[in-house]
């Protein structure tokens, strides 16, 4: 019952927030898969073949295949995120994966390569903002995974902090907050904070500026009252399909 109540609280509080604080081109739902791939080139080739199969490619799903860097938290080496505009797109993607020949061949390839799925989650954007650049150009992102214990207090604190660092030349091209609805992460993660950049160098400059800023020094101890840090890592996009 406690988990059900917490889920209701998250859905209600963040659902209201999402309606008022998302750019029009942001997806309604995201599915995120982190996995360990012993042979990255072959994993990518198998996924690319699936995405370019006739039945899948005609749907023009927005998808990102990426590599993980500085991920010392588990065995994930790569990931795939799907961005769905609505529930119908989400349902269609699941149907094609489960019922088509292309989906069957892709699953067989992954099994033959001994790919291990580490996490599989369904998330929604609770807050998002684009400051500069296009999605296709912002190929690097930093991510922080949290267990938020008091969303009503954490979210406005984080939003105000994020806005306060927009003025710096090292700030990100975009940032957002995602809420976990379903899936396995094994560590109590409820939310993800992300910040996007054109290059790895820009992301590193952001980290330096962030950690030396007075705003972060003030925000950090307050945020720990309402959230628990779980992990952080960098994502570098290897290929984007139909970026919006």
Q: Where on the chain are the PLM-derived regions?
A:
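Short S/T/G/P-rich N-terminal loop/turn motif that feeds into the first structured element of a domain
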Residues: 18-218, 222-244
